[in-house]
Amino acid sequence: MKKRNLLLAALLLILVAPSFAAKVDTLLIKSPSMNKDVQVVVVTPDAALGKKAVACPAIYLLHGYGGNAKTWIGIKPNLPQIADEKGIIFVCPDGKNSWYWDSPKDPS
């Protein structure tokens, strides 16, 4: 009897607990202006996926010098949960070891 009640309680908790289905992808995007591929991590909320997809705003998260495209997922592992809760697409491009990308002295 106790095992059954414990099992039912566990199943109820699983059914009631919120589930987050945001999709985390690591992509290579071709940049014609930089003449190279740029690695990007994209966190897409469930609301922007599937047959009933809706438009969602995007926030670009830029890492600091020495980081990479996966830095923000390491800093904030709950980004998929936030994406689902707020309906936001997070885009995390890899800027390599640069301060900014539009330098006239270094176009690459």
Task: Mark where each language-model region is.
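Bacterial N-terminal signal peptides that target proteins for export
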Residues: M1-L7
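Non-catalytic cap/lid and distal C-terminal segments of serine-dependent acyl enzymes
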Residues: A21-S108
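A broad detector of short, well-ordered amphipathic alpha-helices
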Residues: L7-L8, Q81
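Intrinsically disordered, low-complexity segments enriched in polar/charged small residues
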Residues: L8-A9, N68
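Bacterial N-terminal signal peptides
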Residues: A9-A17
